[in-house]
């Protein structure tokens, strides 16, 4: 990824565990040293855990909540001083949280329930709105994107078993393409998105509003 992005300009990479306070501090220090400030924060780290209700472990549930929700709160809180320094009324700093359509509706993948994932994303959407109100006075906007199904390591299992059902459930009858996420992130990060604040934007081909959703079978 670093090599690919470096084709467009200078780029740095740093591995960090955002659930760890020391790693978060190291990450923000790295950003400040390399860039001198921070104007865009994208909270994109995520985890999932699928299991039947009777077999769903407490530590698995906690891991997902900690990664998808608590770490977003903590990193955002810690990054606010840097974001504030870069922000102006005309060109606010941006926080973009990656939520999920599973935080909008109750998912129906009955064979692989993901209780913690959908709960964490619903909470993240509301945290986005809370942050938007709290940080507006500091000229920081906060929005969330709620993707539908895109190809990724996290979706490998469901694509292998249920891709046709996924496509049938989507009014556009297909899964998302990478450039369709790139476009909405670019909008929110650009001057065109400077007046957008506190929104949760679905990018799911209409799946979250489809009336024909049904349980999937093998």
For each predicted feature, which ranges?
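Catalytic loop of short-chain dehydrogenase/reductase
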Residues: 87-123, 128-137
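Short, small/polar-rich loop/turn modules that mediate ligand/substrate recognition or access, typified
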Residues: 136, 141, 196-198
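Alpha-helical segment proximal to the catalytic Tyr-Lys
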Residues: 81, 133-134, 194
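Substrate-binding pocket helix/loop in short-chain dehydrogenase/reductase
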Residues: 52-53, 57-65, 166
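Short C-terminal tail/terminal secondary-structure segment
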Residues: 186, 197-218
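Short-chain dehydrogenase/reductase
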Residues: 1-35, 48-49, 59-60
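A conserved structural motif in NAD(P)-dependent oxidoreductases
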Residues: 170-181
């Amino acid at each position: 990824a670093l090599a690919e992005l470096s084709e467009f300009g200078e780029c740095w990479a740093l591995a960090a565990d955002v659930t760890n306070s020391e790693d978060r501090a190291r990450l923000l220090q790295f950003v400040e040293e390399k860039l001198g400030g921070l104007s865009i924060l994208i909270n994109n780290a995520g985890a999932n855990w699928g299991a039947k209700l009777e077999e769903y472990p407490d530590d698995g549930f906690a891991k997902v909540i900690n990664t998808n929700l608590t770490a977003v709160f903590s990193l955002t809180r810690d990054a606010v001083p840097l974001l504030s320094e870069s922000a102006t009324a005309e060109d606010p700093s941006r926080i973009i949280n990656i939520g999920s359509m599973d935080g909008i509706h109750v998912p129906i993948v009955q064979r692989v329930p993901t209780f913690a994932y959908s709960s964490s994303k619903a909470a993240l959407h509301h945290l986005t709105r809370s942050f938007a109100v709290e940080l507006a006075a500091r000229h920081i906007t906060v929005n969330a994107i709620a993707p539908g199904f895109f190809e990724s390591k996290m979706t490998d299992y469901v694509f292998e078993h249920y891709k046709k059902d996924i496509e049938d459930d989507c009014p556009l009858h297909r899964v998302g393409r990478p450039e369709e996420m790139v476009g909405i992130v670019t909008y929110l990060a650009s001057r065109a998105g400077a007046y957008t604040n506190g929104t949760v934007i679905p990018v799911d081909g209409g799946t979250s509003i489809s009336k024909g959703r049904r349980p999937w079978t093998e």
